[in-house]
Amino acid sequence: MEDFVRQCFNPMIVELAEKAMKEYGEDPKIETNKFAAICTHLEVCFMYSDFHFIDERSESIIVESGDPNALLKHRFEIIEGRDRTMAWTVVNSICNTTGVEKPKFLPDLYDYKEDRFIEIGVTRREVHTYYLEKANKIKSEKTHIHIFSFTGEEMATKADYTLDEESRARIKTRLFTIRQEMASRGLWDSFVNPREAKRQLKKNLKSLEPCADLPTKVSHRTSPALKTLEPMWMDSNRTAALRASFLKCQKR
C-alpha cells in the first residue's frame, strides 16, 4: 500500500499526509491504510477548491486557465493539510473577518461565497452512515457537510452540493480510479475490511521489528506550500502536478 500511495499521489500530498500522521505519532510505513485514506482526503479537498473563484461582483465563477489580469479571489480557503496551530490561526482569522461562528472542530474548507465552513468526508462505507457520524460529532448546523464515496455516491447537508455537477464528477472519477488501481494491486479488500487491515498492520509491524534499533535519517525540508498563510493550493503549477499524478495513475 505504501508503494501505491507514493506512486499514485502527488509528492506534495504525500508529504502533507506524512506530516499530519507524524504530528499524531503515527507511522505511514506501518499504518498504510490510514496513509492512503489521508492522501485521498487531501486530494479531494484540493480538487474541491480547484478552478473556483469569486469575481469583483462577488459572483462564483470557474476558471481553468487563469487570466493574470482578472480580479479574482479563491472561493475556497483550504484548512486541511496545515499543522493544527496554523489551521486554527486561519480559522480564527476567517471568523474575525466574517463574523462566522467559530467551529469546535477544525473544518476542511471555508466557502467565501456561502460564508460557511465545510467538512469533507471520503468513505469506504455507506454515505448516509458516515454522514450521520460526522453530523453527530460536529453537532453544528453552521458547518456544511459533504460526503463522497468510492462508488460514486455523495451526500450533503440539505442536499446542497455546493459545486457544479462537472466539478463533483471530476472528484468521483478520481475516487473510482483510486479504487480500481487498489483493486488491480490486490489492496482494495484490506482497505475496506477492518479485519484484513488489522492483519496487514500486524504483518507490517512484524516486518519492521528487526530494524527497530537502526538509526533513522530525518528530513527537515519544509514543503513550500506550508510557507505562506495566504489562499493557496489553487495555483496552476499545483493543478498541473495533480493532473499529471492523475494521468500517471490512469495509465498503469
From Swiss-Prot:
GO biological process: viral RNA genome replication; viral translational frameshifting
Record site: Important for efficient shutoff activity and nuclear localization: R195, K198, R199
Record-linked Gene3D superfamilies: Influenza RNA-dependent RNA polymerase subunit PA, endonuclease domain
Localization of this protein: Host cytoplasm; Host nucleus
Catalytic center residues: E80, D108
Keywords for the protein's UniProt record, in alphabetical order: Decay of host mRNAs by virus, Eukaryotic host gene expression shutoff by virus, Host cytoplasm, Host gene expression shutoff by virus, Host mRNA suppression by virus, Host nucleus, Host-virus interaction
Major subcellular location class: host cell
Molecular-function GO terms, alphabetical: RNA binding
UniProt xrefs under InterPro entries: PA/PA-X (IPR001009), PA/PA-X_sf (IPR038372)
Keyword Metal-binding found: no
Site entry (Important for efficient shutoff activity), positions: K202, K203, K206
Family affiliation: Belongs to the influenza viruses PA-X family.
Function noted in UniProt: Plays a major role in the shutoff of the host protein expression by cleaving mRNAs probably via an endonuclease activity. This host shutoff allows the virus to escape from the host antiviral response. Hijacks host RNA splicing machinery to selectively target host RNAs containing introns for destruction. This may explain the preferential degradation of RNAs that have undergone co- or post-transcriptional processing.
Domain notes: The probable endonuclease active site in the N-terminus and the basic amino acid cluster in the C-terminus are important for the shutoff activity. The C-terminus acts as a nuclear localization signal. The C-terminus is recruited to host protein complexes involved in nuclear Pol II RNA processing.
Name of this chain's protein: Protein PA-X
Gene that encodes the chain: PA
